[in-house]
């Protein structure tokens, strides 16, 4: 055996250790505790004014710090997202910080890597969330169908739509996760308001606190720009799937983003207007105001990327809406111009994003109101016309009673003006393409009490003393409650086969409720197919137990699906 003297051995060992140190990669860094959720569109969870609520950026600002407890720091630090370099800079010692931007939403596995000429050493991965309003950072919201909802495939090529209301998350406790989304092609979010104070949004004053809420939302925002009426319900209220204190988007919008991940083919549209929010439309004969509105809708869609277009619910061009002081013969022309300009804006947005955006509108089914607008011209800008073939009669009139959502006129009043068929015929007579017309169904009833003086056992031929006790508001009863409570006992169910309309009547009190049920919806669906119309939609999804939506799907020819 060869022998080394002690000084030489020490020299060799020292030389070897020095070479190993020079050839080693850096030590392993540790990501420090810190924020792991970032957002491209930032939401202030305490704000009430829209201008303060939302901050839109092109990319999320991400920050990460790290420590090195052992080993060499190397010369370069890198941030890896899902294994790809997102940032690099000098490695300066036992700790470091990187600030960088991420322009695409999602969930990323983030690592810090320290590098030198001999290699890189990466930290353990930490998940970060980069939130964007397309919902790409969220797990799909796919919940079991509730109540009587059965699964259907959307394979008929027809529209199956329904409205979901912002305020439904309160007393109704109807949240987005309860929507039977697989049974819909279109979900309309009611309602998006248009900013404006006294003289512009006076109809809102009939609902306690609603006008004041809009003024808070629109603080510092120009009149005739869109906003969010209730930021808490829309973005700040914890809901299933968006419950953490640091979730960037909560509320209805947060859940709708997740719903879109589960049902990417579902078209989700913000509906602007509605009965008490239509006043600003009457001022849009002024092009400056109209341009400001259209521009703000574009900004809204750019901000809230889960939306697929816009629905305009102007009630009603020409007047006879909530505000009796509003309405002009020029409204029809304004409506056509508004549709044309919205379409041009949406086409421009499509060119920028590569997405297709729909333009729809909810309109009255009364011929008197239809004739105020050249829908044969407006249709060229529109994807669908949602014909509100409901609210024909109700306790707003105690002397003239009738079916609120009938397909045809009843035998006892064959000259009834307000029917679904008459509304459709008025549009077709103008030259509107049948496929553009989507017929409305009611997931609620309207009713009276004290009905008396009627003839031939037909309560509609009498008069009433007031509105029937309602589910949430007197005069209006959810279909769910009608089906569950008013189909037996003293209540008498009758189906008017001529009108294709059901009603229930309680002779002892004179309570009378007119509504849609599975049979009347089946008749509407058959009519849609016979006339080659666009489909069916409903107001409003929280009031149904599944019977109405099931019938909408079945009557249009959608086949049974699986959950």
Swiss-Prot record:
EC number, as in UniProt: 3.2.1.14
Catalytic function, reaction form: Random endo-hydrolysis of N-acetyl-beta-D-glucosaminide (1->4)-beta-linkages in chitin and chitodextrins
Cystine pairs: none
Alphabetical UniProt keywords: Carbohydrate metabolism, Chitin degradation, Glycosidase, Hydrolase, Polysaccharide degradation, Signal
GO biological process: chitin catabolic process; polysaccharide catabolic process
Enzyme class per UniProt: hydrolase
Signal peptide: 1-23
Residue span, GH18 domain: 158-559
One term of GO molecular function: endochitinase activity
Xref: SMART domains: Glyco_18, PKD
Active site: 315
Pfam families named in the record: ChitinaseA_N, Glyco_hydro_18
Family the UniProt entry places it in: Belongs to the glycosyl hydrolase 18 family. Chitinase class II subfamily.
PANTHER family the UniProt entry points to: CHITINASE, CHITINASE 12-RELATED
Name of the featured protein: Chitinase A
Species of the source: Serratia marcescens
This protein's encoding gene: chiA
